[in-house]
Amino acid sequence: MAAARLAAALLLLAAQVACEFGVLRVVSQTSRTRSRDYCILYNPQWAHLPHDLSKVSLLKLRDLSTTQLCSYLDVPAEDFTNQIALVARGNCTFYEKVRLAQGSGAHGLLIVSKEKLVPPGGNKTQYEEISIPVALLSHRDLQDIFRRFGREVMVALYAPSEPVMDYNMVIIFVMAVGTVAIGGYWAGSHDVKKYMKHKRDDGPEKQEDEAVDVTPVMICVFVVMCCFMLVLLYYFYDRLVYVIIGIFCLASSTGLYSCLAPFVRKLPFCTCRVPDNNLPYFHKRPQARMLLLALFCVTVSVVWGIFRNEDQWAWVLQDTLGIAFCLYMLKTIRLPTFKACTLLLLVLFIYDIFFVFITPFLTKSGNSIMVEVATGPSNSSTHEKLPMVLKVPRLNTSPLSLCDRPFSLLGFGDILVPGLLVAYCHRFDIQVQSSRIYFVACTIAYGLGLLVTFVALVLMQRGQPALLYLVPCTLLTSCTVALWRRELGAFWTGSGFAKDAPQTPWAATQGPVPPKAVGSSLSEQPPSEELAKSPLSTEEAGAADPAKDPDNPVASPLSPSNGDEAQPIPVVKPETSA
């Protein structure tokens, strides 16, 4: 399998037009101490550029930037011997230009482009015929060269090597593993709190949203929608990208609010509420601090939306909003069984491989649909990028940093999909009281899978479908732990997560499962929840007794008023009358 994947990767690389950045060193012909570097785009299939500047000779730049060099009539009487030819782009192919330049003795060809730089491509026969480098230079950079140095300059073309490993991978690793661990822990604990005693309700905004259980039908519909949306983005990227940006702003601000709300509710100030009114949402009289939090979250999202293309700092806001969105989704979406986890991960595993490795054979350009959409099509007129990724700029210093500010990317799907399995493992840990062994093992497996992804990225030097490595690592690890503990059957079916209240490490071993809401009537409790298998302890009875709360004037008839141990509460069976 490994050999087949490597062969497929090599085939894909061969099918694409090679494209690399290089550096043009410009030196003044009158003063050799004055120099400046400029970015160029070249195709190494014509000829490779040396990596070391010290091994490159400075050559005179022959300025024919007003000529397109498409016929022998464009070749000057004095040839290009020991010179770098500078010509304009257009009217003929790159091959025709470089063939004429090489025939006239040029040691290299620079093509000035007023449009976006594209790889100077050709075919295999043409590559074998040409032995001099071909590179594109932007018209803006050429104007800067003439302004600074004049038209008499010496130049050298080279392609400095970049470090194989960049430190930004460490940042992405910490963000991804941290999000999965925190999100999985939060999602599991969120389910437990529904069965634990609650503090006095301070207002309507105190209530938390219920988790959404994912069914196999929902999984299939979701994957079909993903495929459909990805294909639409591939063909209509420039129109749909703004829709995705708008959705991200809305969803990320909601996620940020959900993450910060528990901390804001603990603040001792701004607890006043809005006056009585009939306005939507405001009729619930939210607290002033929650309104301020909502305003803050919307402001952060809007600021990112306005300045999203500021490479120097906008990526920090994007990552912050992205992590908040992922945490919110991990808390909200719940996979009820390991069977559902396996189905989702395997289907998306196939989806990821298909759109990364198979689609290059189906598209005219020979490019992967997934990579094109994730990084933005090269022919996009908007040059916008999809925000559904964590992105960190390269931290290693390199001369090539003047060409672009390259980012390393990790899609939200590579966090959310394994994260849902981690969340399920935490809930199962709580149910079987296993000291979180499933949760810890699955989180470690995710981290190891991500490390394998980074290694593959370094070795293959191209984008990797992270789920190709994350899905086997997390699924096999979780299954192995279940087999080792002889709990595979219960782990596979979830053992009634949706029905039974979990026995948590924080509850007494022989104690009861507390009701969902203090003081609720018997008719509100499902018959399947045996609420009173054993008496409440004195501490729990006191905490659950509204009569002992000086702020609550309503006393519950189900709680003793003398502080003694509460008596068991009778359970009404559906087939008998009370």
UniProtKB/Swiss-Prot annotation:
UniProt PTM comment: Glycosylated.
Gene3D superfamilies: 3.50.30.30
Pfam families named among the record's database cross-references: PA, Peptidase_A22B
Presence of keyword Transcription regulation: no
Ranges where the PA domain occurs: 61-145
Gene Ontology molecular functions: peptidase activity; protein homodimerization activity
SMART domains for this protein: PSN (SM00730)
EC identifiers of the protein: 3.4.23.-
Compartments (UniProt record): Cell membrane; Golgi apparatus membrane; Lysosome membrane; Endosome membrane
Motif PAL per UniProt: ranges: 465-467
CDD domains named in the record: PA_hSPPL_like
EC class name: hydrolase
Residues in compartment: Cytoplasmic: 190-216, 261-286, 334-341, 427-438, 485-578
Transmembrane stretches, start-end: 169-189, 217-237, 240-260, 287-307, 313-333, 342-362, 406-426, 439-459, 464-484
GO cellular component terms listed in the entry, alphabetical order: actin cytoskeleton; centrosome; cytoplasmic side of endoplasmic reticulum membrane; endosome membrane; Golgi membrane; Golgi-associated vesicle membrane; lumenal side of endoplasmic reticulum membrane; lysosomal membrane
InterPro entries named among the record's database cross-references: PA_dom_sf (IPR046450), PA_domain (IPR003137), Peptidase_A22B_SPP (IPR007369), Preselin/SPP (IPR006639)
Active site as annotated: 352, 414
Segment forming the signal sequence: 1-19
Keyword Glycoprotein: yes
Membrane topology: Multi-pass membrane protein
Function of the molecule: Intramembrane-cleaving aspartic protease (I-CLiP) that cleaves type II membrane signal peptides in the hydrophobic plane of the membrane. Functions in ITM2B and TNF processing. Catalyzes the intramembrane cleavage of the anchored fragment of shed TNF-alpha (TNF), which promotes the release of the intracellular domain (ICD) for signaling to the nucleus. May play a role in the regulation of innate and adaptive immunity.
Family statement drawn from the similarity comment of this UniProt entry: Belongs to the peptidase A22B family.
PANTHER family: SIGNAL PEPTIDE PEPTIDASE, SIGNAL PEPTIDE PEPTIDASE-LIKE 2B
Quaternary structure note: Monomer. Homodimer. Interacts with ITM2B and TNF.
The name this protein goes by in its record: Signal peptide peptidase-like 2B
Organism: Mus musculus (Mouse)
